[in-house]
Swiss-Prot record:
Its main location: cytoplasm. The lineage of its organism: Eukaryota, Fungi, Dikarya, Ascomycota, Taphrinomycotina. It is found in: Cytoplasm. Belongs to the eukaryotic ribosomal protein eL36 family. This is Large ribosomal subunit protein eL36B. Component of the large ribosomal subunit (LSU). Mature yeast ribosomes consist of a small (40S) and a large (60S) subunit. The 40S small subunit contains 1 molecule of ribosomal RNA (18S rRNA) and at least 33 different proteins. The large 60S subunit contains 3 rRNA molecules (25S, 5.8S and 5S rRNA) and at least 46 different proteins. GO terms for cellular component: cytosol; cytosolic large ribosomal subunit; preribosome. GO terms for molecular function: structural constituent of ribosome. Residues 1-32 are annotated as: Disordered. The keyword Kinase does not apply. There are 2 genes for eL36 in S.pombe. It comes from the Eukaryota. The keyword Ribosomal protein applies.
Length: 99
């Protein structure tokens, strides 16, 4: 908005835009600290599912396409499969750094 113009598309008073709180729909899917903490503890206690162990083994043997196909078969969609592959790859990398 232009400052105090009387005519034209930008006519009107100069205003400061209201600072509205964030909508809950904008936060959807964002992981909270508590949820992340609980999931990490569950992962520590329960370990990996059998299909996850198999996928990790395939990734280690550089059979990425086969791993992606297996994950897609088990999880239903390619998007979920890619996310799982990414997660398991980071787990493998962190375990390599630990040793």
């Amino acid at each position: 908005m232009a400052p105090g113009l009387v005519v034209g598309l930008n006519k009107g008073k100069t205003l400061t835009k209201r600072q509205l709180p964030e909508r809950p729909s904008r936060r959807k899917g964002h992981l909270s600290k508590r949820t992340a903490f609980v999931r990490s503890i569950v992962r520590e206690v329960a370990g990996f599912a059998p299909y996850e162990r198999r996928v990790m083994e395939l990734i280690r043997n550089s059979q990425d396409k086969r791993a992606r196909k297996l994950a897609k078969k088990r999880l239903g969609t390619l998007k979920r499969a890619k996310g799982k592959i990414e997660e398991l790859t980071s787990v493998i990398q962190s375990s390599r750094l630990a040793h």
